[in-house]
Amino acid sequence: MSPRKPRPWPDTPAPLSAPVVDNHTHLPTHAGEIPRREGVALSLDEQLDRARKVGVTALVSSACELPDFDPMIDIARAREGVRVALAIHPNEAALHAGCAEPSPDGLTPRVCEHHVPLDEALAAVEARLGDPTVVAVGESGLDYFRTAEPGRQAQKESFRAHIEMADRADLPLQIHDREAHDDTLAILGECASADQRIVFHCYSGDAAMAERGWYASFAGPITYPANEELRAALAVLPRELVLVETDAPYLTPVPWRGCPNASYVMAHTVRFIAQLWDVSEAAACDQLRANTQAVYGSWW
């Protein structure tokens, strides 16, 4: 058996030519969430410091489980450049509805104390949307990879509610869409208003879906060699609809795939997009930052 490949925290990349924003990440709300690799666990503030040094000067951190709402808002209040997206994650929505059947991937979900009835959880989201640190509703949507059939109805109910509350609050909506493209698009067509700012976070659709006119946020997977469909989607998207994100601590871009992810590592994804666009790094950064401002406004 070959020795296990080391998966350290990525080195800090060279600074970008212009500042950018991580449109979707998950900052650790508790120290125990930070992975330790080769004896190193980068603290929240060290992750943010590295991000600033490479030019990722602001970020939107998604809290999509009830216990994380207030800690994430507190983090944003105390740290320059950090803003928050709030929602009940689709997999959480099923648990709030009491659906804990084994999922298609073989895992059995665990209902916890914080899984209050779904209507109470949704009310907790809406009650916090007026906080000045909250700039988006998200991530909400559908996830058929991790949820069995009974839970999918709860996901649909939750998704509709999030679309409506984002519209009422005049906030953009970050969408989680995993193996559920058709139903996600159907519900958007049914519930979303014509001028809603809709962002498909960690975009996973194809070129045809990219032509529908919503924002698409690309994460590390666009750098993976097998993901030609993602690159085809980027090629047909108007550049003013393209955003960039990490979805950290997941989906680390090449050349650090498999290692822990954080906002500072997004520089690799930005440079990859610049190459695909065949523009200078500075031009790509300026375009991505302008797109972010069009969706969320500016706080940096």
Segments from the language model and where they lie:
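Mid-domain alpha/beta scaffold segments of enzyme catalytic cores
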Residues: 1-300
